[in-house]
UniProtKB/Swiss-Prot annotation:
Superkingdom per UniProt: Bacteria
Subunit structure as annotated in this protein's UniProt entry: F-type ATPases have 2 components, CF(1) - the catalytic core - and CF(0) - the membrane proton channel. CF(1) has five subunits: alpha(3), beta(3), gamma(1), delta(1), epsilon(1). CF(0) has three main subunits: a, b and c.
PANTHER family, per database record: ATP SYNTHASE GAMMA CHAIN, ATP SYNTHASE GAMMA CHAIN, CHLOROPLASTIC
Name the record gives this protein: ATP synthase gamma chain
GO MF entries: ATP binding; proton-transporting ATP synthase activity, rotational mechanism
Assigned keywords, A-Z: ATP synthesis, CF(1), Hydrogen ion transport, Ion transport, Membrane, Thylakoid, Transport
Source species: Synechococcus sp. (strain CC9311)
Cellular component GO terms held in the UniProt record: plasma membrane-derived thylakoid membrane; proton-transporting ATP synthase complex
InterPro entries: ATP_synth_F1_ATPase_gsu, ATP_synth_F1_gsu
Membrane topology type: Peripheral membrane protein
Amino acid sequence: MANLKEIRDRIKSVKNTRKITEAMRLVAAAKVRRAQEQVLRSRPFADRLARLLENLQARMRFEDADAPLLEQRAVQTITLMAVTGDRGLCGGYNSNIIKRTEKRFAELQRQGYKVALVLIGRKAISYFTNRNYPIQATFTGLEQVPTADEAGSIASEIFAEFLSETSDRVEIIFTKFINLVSCKPVVQTLLPLDPQGIAEADDEIFRLTTKEGRLSVEAGSAPENSQPALPSDIVFEQSPDQLLNALLPLYLQNQLLRSLQESAASELASRMTAMNNASDNAKELAKTLTLDYNKARQAAITQEILEVVGGSAAAGA
């Protein structure tokens, strides 16, 4: 059995580690709430924009519209975007996206398409660069709560590639946020665009509460969108082509922003869960080590008593 000093040092190290993981859990929990609040704040605009585009498309159903972002052409080259984080310590969040990207890349290549990667996050960049995958562009340093400006800069890149016909289709692989313990990597086509609505009816929101003196998170339903329907007799001064070409890039940016927001919330939730598990494991390990320490200390005391008794017996003999 290890000596008492070694066990004491291990107990101290485990307790210090638990303090760090607990702090990281609390920070991630607070940021999850911020990420969700941002999604909810942007939802009315996203929903109204989608309805406006649907209205335009319905009116243009029998017209020959010139909207490049809606152009369906023969697909030869596909841009595959992957969204990971810049940091680790978030469970399987990054590895799940990387595995899904590798699988999708192989599927598209087997179908005869030429595939290039657009990577968001240092984890994806490091992994695919070291394995010599064809990389078209990379982006790092995004905020924990993604902004419209960040989404706009990325959207401009893929927008230019699509318009120049360097890429015939753009797909994005990101982590869809389901709840605090469940996130799912999904594949979504960004270009050509097909506006069909944005808001998810079953979204959950989370509130920070205290339970038994410890910070916890409780789930609740997202508030329903109360935006009124667009009037059917609305009149547009500009031509449908002009409106579409002005609104579609905005819609693309919004779709990309939504994907980044979902990914950010998923990463934070995964980190919070991972740090919570690490804190619990550290607590159990500290208990086990404390028990070992007490046993070792008791054994040492017993041994000392036996030595004293034995010495006394030998002296009296």
